[in-house]
Amino acid sequence: MAQLWLSCFLLPALVVSVAANVAPKFLANMTSVILPEDLPVGAQAFWLVAEDQDNDPLTYGMSGPNAYFFAVTPKTGEVKLASALDYETLYTFKVTISVSDPYIQVQREMLVIVEDRNDNAPVFQNTAFSTSINETLPVGSVVFSVLAVDKDMGSAGMVVYSIEKVIPSTGDSEHLFRILANGSIVLNGSLSYNNKSAFYQLELKACDLGGMYHNTFTIQCSLPVFLSISVVDQPDLDPQFVREFYSASVAEDAAKGTSVLTVEAVDGDKGINDPVIYSISYSTRPGWFDIGADGVIRVNGSLDREQLLEADEEVQLQVTATETHLNIYGQEAKVSIWVTVRVMDVNDHKPEFYNCSLPACTFTPEEAQVNFTGYVDEHASPRIPIDDLTMVVYDPDKGSNGTFLLSLGGPDAEAFSVSPERAVGSASVQVLVRVSALVDYERQTAMAVQVVATDSVSQNFSVAMVTIHLRDINDHRPTFPQSLYVLTVPEHSATGSVVTDSIHATDPDTGAWGQITYSLLPGNGADLFQVDPVSGTVTVRNGELLDRESQAVYYLTLQATDGGNLSSSTTLQIHLLDINDNAPVVSGSYNIFVQEEEGNVSVTIQAHDNDEPGTNNSRLLFNLLPGPYSHNFSLDPDTGLLRNLGPLDREAIDPALEGRIVLTVLVSDCGEPVLGTKVNVTITVEDINDNLPIFNQSSYNFTVKEEDPGVLVGVVKAWDADQTEANNRISFSLSGSGANYFMIRGLVLGAGWAEGYLRLPPDVSLDYETQPVFNLTVSAENPDPQGGETIVDVCVNVKDVNDNPPTLDVASLRGIRVAENGSQHGQVAVVVASDVDTSAQLEIQLVNILCTKAGVDVGSLCWGWFSVAANGSVYINQSKAIDYEACDLVTLVVRACDLATDPGFQAYSNNGSLLITIEDVNDNAPYFLPENKTFVIIPELVLPNREVASVRARDDDSGNNGVILFSILRVDFISKDGATIPFQGVFSIFTSSEADVFAGSIQPVTSLDSTLQGTYQVTVQARDRPSLGPFLEATTTLNLFTVDQSYRSRLQFSTPKEEVGANRQAINAALTQATRTTVYIVDIQDIDSAARARPHSYLDAYFVFPNGSALTLDELSVMIRNDQDSLTQLLQLGLVVLGSQESQESDLSKQLISVIIGLGVALLLVLVIMTMAFVCVRKSYNRKLQAMKAAKEARKTAAGVMPSAPAIPGTNMYNTERANPMLNLPNKDLGLEYLSPSNDLDSVSVNSLDDNSVDVDKNSQEIKEHRPPHTPPEPDPEPLSVVLLGRQAGASGQLEGPSYTNAGLDTTDL
């Protein structure tokens, strides 16, 4: 009874509790989500967020056909990407998201929008590119068009084409083609099959305009493709001769048809090679030659070399080669070439005589002659040719055939000779005088000879007659009776005075040869006298010029000349008579040089009078005229001897006279009238070096700056008293320590003064740091070796300037090492510099920073990491920014600067480099590389230790810090119903590396269960292996989709398995085309002959899509039937049945067996139910009787016991709410009344909400409370037993042990 009341209170409370629970709900924005398609698998996609007013724990989930893209963490709602997204395949889809508390589940449909990313490179369509174009294709024409497709959208899907390379790679072909934005390739220059190239290969590339990919602006480019362009030759070129020049020779007596030479021409268009026809379009000798179709030039008529002498014995042929077909312009394609044929000589002519002069001879018959005339003077000298003889011998043959000999014959042949005696071709013939005595006009006036010309080979000859006429000559001269005539005449006689008129010459010749003409031959005095040409009288021509003192005797030659210009002469000796007409003449000039102090003057004045010697006209007297210095000298009046009276001093003479003393001497004769002459005697007193130079100062001090080459240091000045430049010229010289650093150059000022300019050479400068003071000695001396010298001290002080650049200390530039990622701070190095200048102000400057990674310049990445202070301290600026993976070597290029350096000098040192090596620390965790793959497992085909999936990872650290080791953390199998089953030891992973990428190969350890349907989720960990410090790791989850045996499809063929195996590739291709899946063929076997009716063999295969789903047999059948081409091909290959006939028969038998078994089970259940119903009805009736008896007995209970209402089945507690009078036992109790005497559940009702029963009997409750723990509850006693037991307890005061009953019959539950 207590259980009944407890149930009555608990059941309404439970209903109220359930009714009061509020369902959770998603947030308002949980309707759609936008995800980029390049989101990595395993990355967080979004969160499912819901709220529950009851604050119950929430569980999140996702379902629907596309739910496989995501993995939901049920407790947190985190959604990670489980399968890669692809905008181009599925840009939007829906999933059903759910959230539930312990009582209610709420679902909502969510729209997933995939955002496009630039993950696809352009792909060229129909990549087998080749074309042919004519070489005459106009520039700008479209050669070919290509198309590249980019599946991406927007700018990432817009394609730009480019030509990367043109083969052959020449200067002409580089820009021969260009590609337009639409993919059209346009000809950009002219083509030539023959002159350029007959084939081009273009390397093409297509790139998109770029877009975001993995959060980086990325430009995707296609793989290069190649376009082959063949240039088709066109007939646009003329033929070409294979040689640039043709020549040959042929004898002039060659017979007709003789082959001379062969010409050859080919079509200029090598790709066409049109046949060529030859012809002679022009010939300098038409008809002599012709040409055949084979290009052979032959003799076509008689040849005569002598007709070609003006043409250099050659015949010029213009040979034309014409192509058989017209060119592209409708014109004949032809080319011409000149062929030279030289005609060789044959000896077929004899020499002939011609009256002409070379080279004007034409050798025509009109010029041919055999009689010639000439003239010559009598007694002409030997080898004198005959005048007016124009004889030419000509033999038109060549070489030895044209060689001939000349000789003389006839009556006068001994007096003459012929020239030349031998000649080739042609020659001018001369007849020369051989014996002069035989050529005499007085003996004969004309002579005759024969000239014979004989061919040297054939001995054929010709003869010509030459008549020679002699000319008379003047062979007598005029003669004088005497060879010498002596004559006299006074000097200065009047013009026209006769000297003589008695001298005459005679000539025995008569006529013109005997007429005499007189003349004075040019010579001494011929201009003073003259002769009458007819009479021979000699007279004075110019008496003023007759001067005995100039010339006392004249010798003249008088010549007599006849009419033939023959002459003779005689000598005239004419003496002049003297008169006193000449003053004395002093001989020469008197310039006397004498050294001062030591030299003496002793000179005789030489004078003469041209008048006749030994007379007063020629006697002389000497007199010294007064002058400034004449008192120092004496002169003898008769002899003219001049002497000095004492020593002479140069310095006593006026310097303006430069040492010269001029004396005047008068020389006179004793004639009438007296004549005199003055002469100057110049006495030069030569200066001697008897004075030393003197400096104007006793010492000199100069100051000069260092590093100033060529500068003037100072000027010294000296004077020499000597008057001549030779003696007072001063030269300066330097000596002393460091004198080689200076140079001194003297300058003459005049009057013995000179300056010495002390300066530095142009290429020498002083260095204060080396030597600050120079003590020099300057010498002033005369060039005279006998002269002395004077010295003076010169002190040169070097003024220091800041002229030296600083230098960097090499030791301070030794490389240092700095760890990345903030491992070090502050100062890391000090750059030290020095300067020898005393006023130096140094600072260290940073010139450049070089950032390199593995020797490659990475730009300005590291510029802010370090700084250099003016004192040379090197500091770390951005310790956190130092990244070994970006830059492993920083080179600080520094220099030292002297701020006090004087202008014009180098203020900077040479650049130095401080190498800072960045040391790697393990600061980068491994990261997985995206894999756009779907891994599918067909357990039936997978073998142990074979790769089924792979991962790739990279670590940006280096060395051991970048070595990655893969491991499998967890393997879960998610079945199709959503259940997750953990697996351990199913897969293993093996690590390998290539370059800096590590790969993990996932392999099954054992064979996989082919009956499992679902997905393996493999969690892979990648962790590095640092030398020091903790390791870093990354994880990713792979989905391995399984294809179980339920997707195994069987195709039956009418051919044996051997033929099916042979056609395996064709069958696979047809199935792939029909299904668009990957076909995995499992087995090919023959069908048992006893079981098969028609098919002979079967093929088992799986058909798997890239996303891991597979085709069932029904889906396969539909897809094959929808593709008629593939179906036709499969039928041709022997396909007869989709699915196994045996399996269908076995399935039918199995269905029949299942139906029979089902009917048997149903019949058995009906019998059991009927039996049970019968037993229970009877039991119920007996129980009611027992209950009635128990009620009666209960009324007889002892005093003090409260009587209770009768418990009648179907009444009282069996009539309470939700009581079941027939099924009043717990659902776990199937016992019947007679199995348990203590079962009294008829006295309580069963709560339909739980399995707990409520005891109404107090004693029964006490019994339960005293039961030992962990003892299974005893079956509830029947009401009657309870009553009887209670009664017995009340009577005896104790309970008896329960008797054994069959619990299976203690209930009416069915």
Swiss-Prot record:
Q: Where are the transmembrane segments?
A: 1155-1175
- In terms of one coarse class, where is the protein primarily found? membrane
Residues making up the signal peptide according to the UniProt record:
1-20
Spell out the residue ranges making up region: Mediates interaction with USH1C and MYO7B and is required for proper localization to microvilli tips and function in microvilli organization.
1180-1310
- Effect the entry attributes to changing L1310R: Loss of interaction with USH1C
List, alphabetically, the PANTHER family matched: CADHERIN-RELATED FAMILY MEMBER 2 (PTHR24026:SF133), FAT ATYPICAL CADHERIN-RELATED (PTHR24026)
Q: What is this protein called?
A: Cadherin-related family member 2
Species in which this protein is naturally found: Homo sapiens (Human)
Q: Which gene encodes it?
A: CDHR2
